[in-house]
Curated annotation (Swiss-Prot):
It comes from the Bacteria. The keyword Thylakoid does not apply. One of its GO terms (biological process) is RNA repair. Its cofactor is Mg(2+). CTP binds at residues 27, 30, 111, 154, 157, 160, 163. InterPro entries: Bact_CCA-adding_enz_type3_sf (IPR050264), CCA-adding_enz_C (IPR032810), CCA-adding_enz_firmicutes (IPR023068), NT_sf (IPR043519), PolA_pol_head_dom (IPR002646), PolyA_RNA-bd (IPR032828). SUPFAM superfamilies: Nucleotidyltransferase, Poly A polymerase C-terminal region-like. The keyword Nucleotidyltransferase applies. It comes from Listeria monocytogenes serotype 4b (strain F2365). This is CCA-adding enzyme. A single active site specifically recognizes both ATP and CTP and is responsible for their addition. CDD domains: NT_ClassII-CCAase. Pfam families: PolyA_pol, PolyA_pol_RNAbd, tRNA_NucTran2_2. ATP binds at residues 27, 30, 111, 154, 157, 160, 163.
Length: 393
């Protein structure tokens, strides 16, 4: 049995010893059945939150309104959630009310897909009222109950369906795909932040190309930031070899290269990306458009290692030669990598000249930077001083 389950087993045992039901549920059970890596576990129980808190010496009310208590066991923290049913969904994401219950099956009934609605007890026996194991065996993503109801409850489940297709290389069952297509407009009610998370997970999957093809088939792109009417661009984007991707930034660079938005900055901001990512992708965009494989010395210098590495990564994804080693060698051979590497500063110029500060200081440093970069002058203080015409003291 997987070590992650064995380590968490005392949590289940304490709950069952106290007279309650307790199970591992959700993605960890699914991934165990698929022989995938398991990083953490979710635990569901018939014990109500206050009852859970009485059983464990250390607990935290991390999501008690929805039945979740975090407990500490053997110096590890585990989320324990009470079986529950949910009322109507008012915003296509959150239920209007949550009712704690004692029935495992009723709890599993509210979950998104049958493969995620399997529970495993302390003896590692499975409870599978919705035939999730069969769906896994058939490599099928099938909604629990009516797919239309599950998507209406939380519209993000539609993106999760496409993401799971990519990650697991599964297919959607006919009813689930039909509901996905008929209710796709509900995705507009989902926050961009949640969409971005699912998009990245989808792109990191082994079947990203098929996932994008399904996404286009159901017109999901209409409700993704900046991708409305970009079907042909996304088809091109999907055709590249994304299994060669090593960074998240290459996904965003690839997307802007395919879509060619008028304002790259605004396009990336619409996805709510970190400023650091936006700046890097924006800087790399023009070079990536040219599919630059050879770099002049000043181009390498002004681009910087992060940019040329990212451009090279996208080139490889797009089927070009991997020039990372060659370009890295050329970059490392540069006499300087930024103006900060110069052997002189503005203070030196003021001292040597005896003049007051002004625009001339920056202009002179720029001149020295160009001189050093072109090997016209060595990056040594005394040589630079002579080169600028200042006499030895």
């Amino acid at each position: 049995m997987n070590d992650v389950f064995l380590k968490a087993l005392p949590v289940l045992q304490k709950l069952t010893t106290a007279g309650f039901e307790a199970y591992f549920v959700g993605g960890s059970v699914r991934d165990y059945l698929l022989n995938r890596t398991i990083s953490d576990v979710d635990i569901a129980t018939s014990a109500f939150p206050e009852e859970v808190k009485e059983i464990f010496q250390t607990s935290y009310d991390t999501g008690i309104a929805h039945g979740t208590v975090t407990v500490r066991e053997n110096n590890e923290f585990y989320e324990v959630t009470t079986f529950r049913t949910e009322g109507t969904y008012e915003d296509f994401r959150r239920p209007s009310e949550v009712t704690f219950i004692r029935s495992l099956e009723e709890d599993l009934k509210r979950r998104d897909f049958t493969m995620n609605a399997i529970a495993m007890d302390e003896h590692f026996a499975l409870q599978d009222p919705f035939s999730g194991q069969l769906a896994i065996q058939n490599k099928e993503i099938k909604a629990v109950g009516k797919a239309s109801e599950r998507f209406h409850e939380d519209a993000l489940r539609m993106m999760r369906a496409v993401r799971f297709l990519s990650q697991l290389d599964f297919e959607l069952d006919k009813e689930t795909e039909k509901a996905l297509e008929s209710q796709i407009e509900l995705l507009q009610h989902t926050s961009v932040e949640r969409i971005t998370v699912e998009w990245l997970k989808m792109m990191k999957g082994k079947a990203a190309k098929r996932a994008i093809e399904l996404l286009l088939k159901v017109k999901m792109e209409t409700y993704l930031p900046g991708l409305k009417d970009e079907k042909s661009a996304l088809s091109e984007f999907a055709s590249w070899d994304w299994e060669k991707r090593t960074t998240e930034e290459s996904i965003w660079l690839g997307l802007v290269v395919a879509v060619k938005p008028n304002n790259v900055n605004a396009f990336l901001k619409a996805w709510k990306l970190p400023n650091k990512t936006i700046q890097l992708v924006n800087k790399a965009y023009q070079d990536a458009l040219k599919m630059k494989e050879t770099w002049l010395k000043d181009e390498l210098y002004h681009a910087g290692k992060a940019v040329f590495s990212l451009v090279n990564e996208l080139n490889v994804i797009r089927g070009k030669e991997n020039n990372q080693h060659k370009v890295s060698q050329a970059y490392e051979a540069l006499p300087i990598h930024s103006k900060k590497d110069l052997a002189i500063t503005g203070a030196d110029l003021l001292k040597w000249s005896g003049e007051s500060a002004g625009p001339w200081v920056k202009e002179t440093l720029d001149k020295v930077e160009c001189g050093v970069l072109s090997n016209e002058i060595n990056n040594e203080k005394i040589q630079i001083k002579r080169w600028l015409g200042y006499h030895e003291e």
